[in-house]
C-alpha cells in the first residue's frame, strides 16, 4: 500500500508492480498521476490518518496488505498508523509523529544530545518576539507541520518579525510554528535505509538553496562534491538523529547543515527523499533502485544489494521563469533529445500565474541530467534551459487578443476562434465546438439577439452602477456565470486536460466574483472530474447532469455533488437526443413530471432544469419543484433549425416570473447582450464557448479577464441606460426591430 499518488510516488508504484506485487494507492485526488498506475486506487487524503486506517482495514479484508510506505510526502504518521493497525513492519506511531512535527523532532534531538539548532515553539506574535529576543538574529521561522519549505523565512531584525510570523502562520495547517537559530553553511540531503536498527546510507547530495529570505531548493547534485570526511561526519550526526527518533525499520531522509561548529540536523523524516533524489538522480548516479529496497523493508525483508554499480554525476535543476502569466510552452520534446538529459518535468500550463518562488512547490519545472562529470551535466542542463521556451506575459499584457491567439494555436482545427463567435464560420459541429446539423440553431441564437437594440437614457446621475447579484445565497459580482461544457478531448480536441479545464473555469469564475456551471459528459465516469474541481474550490460551482435513462445514475451524481459541497445541482433535460451520448452508447430519455419530482426529492440542494424553450415546459418545471430554469437550446447542439433563446424569453418570463429563477444562455458575447437579456426578464446569463476558449487559451487568468471585461461592458451599458442597479434594468431600454414569427404554444 502506497500512501500518496503524486508524481514522486510513481517510481515506487511501478517498481512494486515489476516485483510482481499488486499496489493499492491512496490519494485525495482521484486524478493524481499515481492513481492511474494503481492496481487498486482509493480516494483518501494522505493527511487523514483515521480515514486511511479505516480504508486500509476494509481493503485488507478483501486484498491482504503485506506492507505500507510513502516516498516524498509528509505522510509518515499515516504510514505508521496503518502499519500498526494491520500489524505490518514499521515504526511506532509516536515516533512517526516525532519525525513529522518539527517541535517534537527538535525536542527528541535535545533529549538525546543530537546536534541541531536551538529553538522555541511559537503560537502567537508575542511568542515570536520573545523567541527572537532570546535566540538573537538571524533566526528562521517555519510551520511545525508542513514540508517543501512552505512558510519558511529568515528573520534578520525585529522589524521583520510580524510579516514573517504572518507568512509562516498562513502555511501551517495547525497554526503551530517554530523559531530556531539560523545555521550558516553548506547543506546536504542524505537518504538512508534502516533494517533491524542497522543504518545504510545511500545517496548524499549537495543542495542548492536560493531566493533569500526564503529557502527554495533550486537543485541538487548527486553525489556530493564535499570531502569524504565531511560527508562521514554528517552521516554520523544523522545516524544519531535516526536513533533518537526511533526509526529502527524503514527509511530516513535528512537535511544536514555543515556549520562552523560541525554538522547539525535541519530536518529528518522517516521516509525517502522527494525532490527527485531517491527516485531519479540516485539511480541514475549509481544504478541502484532505492525504491526496491524501500519496498523490501516495508515487507519485512532484508534489502538486497545496495552497492553502486557505477559512479556517475546526476543533477536536478529547477526551471524558474520570470513572474507573469504563462502564454505558451514549447520545445520540451526537442530538449529531451539533448545528450545527458534524462527527464524534464513541467509544472505549469498556459494561463497559470507564476511568481517569484517562496517554497519548493512554486517552480515552473525540473530538469534531470546525468553525465560522467558535473561540468558535462551542468552543460546539458544549460542547453536544455536555452531550448525550452516557457513564454511569459505580464499581467498588464493580458488581452482578449493574446488569449484568442493562444487558444487558436491550441484548438487548431476544432475551433477557429472567430472574431464573432456566432456559428457562421465554425470549424466543427458536434462533436466539436459548433452546432448540430447545418448549425442553424447556433446561428439563430446570435440572430435573435440582433433583433433587439438598446434605447439609451442619458439624463440621470448614475456614474458607478452596482452590477452585483446573488443566486441561492451566493454573492455574484454580476449576474453572469460560465455555462457547463465538457469533453476536453471529444469537443476541444485534447487542447486541454479535462481536470485542468474544470479548474480553470471554476477558479477563473471565482476570481471574477461569480461561479461556474460544470458539465457531466457522455463518459459515465467524467462527472468525477468535475467533482474533483469542486472539492478543490470548496464546492463553488453547479454541476449539471445528463438525463440518463436510469434515474439512479442521476441521483448517484447528485449525491457526489452534495459531498463536494456544490452550490446547487441540475439537469440539462434537453439532452435526450444527443450525438456525443450516442457515440458513447449512453442511454438517455425524457423525464415525466413524476420522475422529475422523484429526482428533485432526492436532494436538499437547489435544483435547476436546463433546456427549457417554451412556456409549457417552464410551467411544468415550476410544478416539479425546480428552483431555477435555464432557457437554452443547448447552444444549438441538440437539434437543427431551433428558435433562438431570445425568441422565447419573453413568453417564458410572462408564464413563470416570480415562481422560479430564470436563467438564459445562447449566443451572449458582450455586456450589451447581457443587458438585453436582463431587460427582457432573465435574472442571470450563462456563457459557454467564449469561456471555454479563454480557459484553453490561458487558463483561469484568461477566464477571469474575460468575465471582468464583460462586467465592465455591462457597467458602461447601464450608465448609458440610467440603470443604477441590476433591478433597474427594465424592458423599456430595449426595442425589438424585426418581426418575430414565432408563436408560443397555447397552454391548455
Positions of predicted regions on the chain:
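ATP-binding N-terminal substructure of ATP-dependent carboxylate-amine bond-forming enzymes
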Residues: 1-95, 126, 348-353, 357-362, ...
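A conserved helix-loop-beta module that forms one wall/lid of the active-site cleft
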Residues: 84-151, 158
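Peripheral (often C-terminal) accessory segments that flank ATP-dependent C-N-forming ligase machineries
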Residues: 128, 295-397
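Internal nucleotide-binding/catalytic subdomain
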Residues: 154-263, 272
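Active-site "cap" helix and flanking loop/linker of ATP-utilizing ligase/carboxylase catalytic domains
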Residues: 233-254, 260, 269-329
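An N-cap/entry alpha-helix motif that binds or orients negatively charged groups
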Residues: 398-477, 729, 735-748
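N-terminal functional module of multi-domain proteins
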Residues: 442-522, 527
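Alpha/beta enzyme core
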Residues: 536, 548-664, 671-694
Amino acid at each position: 500500500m502506497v500512501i500518496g499518488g503524486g508524481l514522486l510516488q510513481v517510481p515506487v508504484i511501478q517498481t512494486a508492480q515489476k516485483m510482481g506485487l499488486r499496489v493499492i494507492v491512496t490519494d485525495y485526488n482521484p486524478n493524481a498521476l499515481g492513481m492511474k498506475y494503481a492496481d487498486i486506487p482509493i480516494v483518501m487524503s494522505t493527511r487523514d490518518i483515521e480515514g486511511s486506517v479505516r480504508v486500509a482495514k476494509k481493503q485488507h479484508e478483501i486484498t491482504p496488505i503485506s506492507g505500507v510506505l510513502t516516498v516524498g510526502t509528509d505522510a509518515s504518521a499515516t504510514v505508521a498508523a496503518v502499519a500498526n493497525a494491520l500489524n505490518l513492519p514499521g515504526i511506532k506511531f509516536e515516533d512517526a509523529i516525532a519525525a513529522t512535527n518539527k517541535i517534537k523532532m527538535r525536542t527528541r534531538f535535545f533529549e538525546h544530545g543530537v546536534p541541531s539548532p536551538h529553538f522555541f515553539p511559537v503560537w502567537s506574535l508575542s511568542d515570536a518576539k520573545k523567541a527572537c529576543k532570546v535566540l538573537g538574529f538571524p533566526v528562521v521561522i517555519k510551520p511545525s507541520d508542513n514540508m517543501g519549505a512552505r512558510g519558511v523565512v529568515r528573520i534578520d531584525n525585529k522589524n521583520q518579525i510580524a510579516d514573517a510570523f504572518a507568512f509562516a502562520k498562513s502555511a501551517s495547517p495547525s497554526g503551530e510554528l517554530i523559531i530556531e537559530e539560523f545555521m550558516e553553511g553548506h547543506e546536504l540531503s542524505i537518504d538512508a535505509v534502516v533494517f533491524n536498527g542497522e543504518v545504510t546510507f545511500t545517496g548524499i547530495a549537495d543542495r542548492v538553496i536560493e531566493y533569500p529570505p526564503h529557502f527554495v531548493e533550486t537543485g541538487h547534485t548527486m553525489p556530493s562534491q564535499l570531502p569524504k570526511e565531511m560527508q562521514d561526519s554528517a552521516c554520523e550526526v544523522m545516524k544519531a538523529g535516526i536513533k533518537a527518533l526511533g526509526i529502527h525499520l524503514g527509511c530516513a531522509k535528512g537535511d544536514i547543515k555543515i556549520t562552523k561548529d560541525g554538522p547539525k540536523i535541519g530536518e529528518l523524516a522517516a521516509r525517502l527523499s522527494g525532490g527527485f533524489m531517491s527516485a531519479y538522480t540516485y539511480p541514475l548516479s549509481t544504478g541502484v533502485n532505492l525504491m526496491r529496497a524501500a519496498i523490501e523493508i516495508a515487507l519485512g525483508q532484508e534489502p538486497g544489494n545496495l552497492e553502486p554499480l557505477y559512479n556517475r554525476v546526476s543533477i536536478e535543476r529547477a526551471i524558474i521563469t520570470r513572474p507573469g502569466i504563462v502564454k505558451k510552452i514549447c520545445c520540451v520534446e526537442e530538449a529531451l533529445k539533448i545528450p545527458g538529459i534524462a527527464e524534464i518535468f513541467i509544472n505549469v500550463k498556459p494561463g497559470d500565474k507564476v511568481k517569484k518562488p517562496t517554497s519548493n512547490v512554486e517552480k515552473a519545472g525540473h530538469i534531470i541530467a546525468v553525465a560522467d562529470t558535473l561540468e558535462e551535466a551542468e552543460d546539458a542542463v544549460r542547453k536544455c534551459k536555452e531550448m525550452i521556451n516557457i513564454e511569459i506575459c505580464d499581467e498588464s499584457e493580458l488581452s482578449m487578443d493574446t488569449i484568442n491567439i493562444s487558444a487558436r494555436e491550441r484548438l487548431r482545427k476544432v475551433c477557429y476562434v472567430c472574431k464573432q463567435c456566432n456559428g457562421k464560420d465554425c470549424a466543427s459541429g458536434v462533436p466539436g465546438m459548433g452546432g448540430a446539423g447545418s448549425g442553424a440553431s447556433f446561428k439563430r441564437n446570435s440572430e435573435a439577439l440582433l433583433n433587439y437594440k438598446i434605447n439609451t437614457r442619458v439624463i440621470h446621475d448614475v456614474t458607478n452602477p452596482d452590477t452585483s447579484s446573488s443566486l441561492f445565497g451566493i454573492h455574484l459580482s454580476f449576474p453572469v456565470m460560465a455555462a457547463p461544457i465538457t469533453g476536453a478531448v471529444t469537443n476541444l480536441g485534447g487542447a486541454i486536460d479535462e481536470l485542468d479545464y474544470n479548474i480553470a473555469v471554476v477558479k477563473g469564475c471565482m476570481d471574477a466574483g461569480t461561479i461556474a456551471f460544470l458539465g457531466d459528459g457522455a463518459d459515465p465516469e467524467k462527472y468525477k472530474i468535475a467533482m474533483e474541481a469542486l472539492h478543490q474550490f470548496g464546492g463553488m460551482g453547479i454541476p449539471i447532469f445528463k438525463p440518463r435513462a436510469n434515474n439512479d445514475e442521476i441521483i448517484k451524481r447528485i449525491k457526489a455533488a452534495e459531498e463536494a459541497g456544490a452550490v446547487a445541482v441540475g439537469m440539462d433535460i434537453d439532452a435526450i437526443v444527443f450525438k456525443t451520448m450516442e457515440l458513447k452508447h449512453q442511454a438517455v430519455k425524457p423525464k415525466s413530471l413524476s420522475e422529475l419530482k422523484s429526482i428533485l426529492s432526492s436532494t436538499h440542494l437547489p435544483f435547476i432544469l436546463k433546456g427549457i424553450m417554451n412556456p409549457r415546459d417552464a410551467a411544468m418545471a415550476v410544478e416539479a419543484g425546480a428552483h431555477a430554469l435555464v432557457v437554452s437550446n443547448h447552444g444549438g447542439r441538440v437539434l437543427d433549425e431551433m428558435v433562438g433563446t431570445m425568441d422565447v424569453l419573453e413568453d417564458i418570463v410572462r408564464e413563470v416570473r416570480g415562481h422560479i429563477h430564470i436563467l438564459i444562455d445562447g449566443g451572449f458575447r458582450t455586456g450589451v447582450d447581457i443587458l438585453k437579456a436582463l431587460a427582457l426578464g432573465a435574472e442571470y446569463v450563462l456563457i459557454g464557448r467564449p469561456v471555454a476558449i479563454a480557459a484553453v487559451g490561458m487558463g483561469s487568468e484568461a477566464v477571469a479577464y474575460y468575465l471582468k471585461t464583460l462586467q465592465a461592458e455591462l457597467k458602461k451599458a447601464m450608465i448609458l441606460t440610467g440603470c443604477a442597479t441590476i433591478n433597474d434594468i427594465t424592458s423599456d431600454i430595449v426595442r425589438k426591430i424585426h418581426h418575430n414569427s414565432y408563436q408560443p404554444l397555447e397552454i391548455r
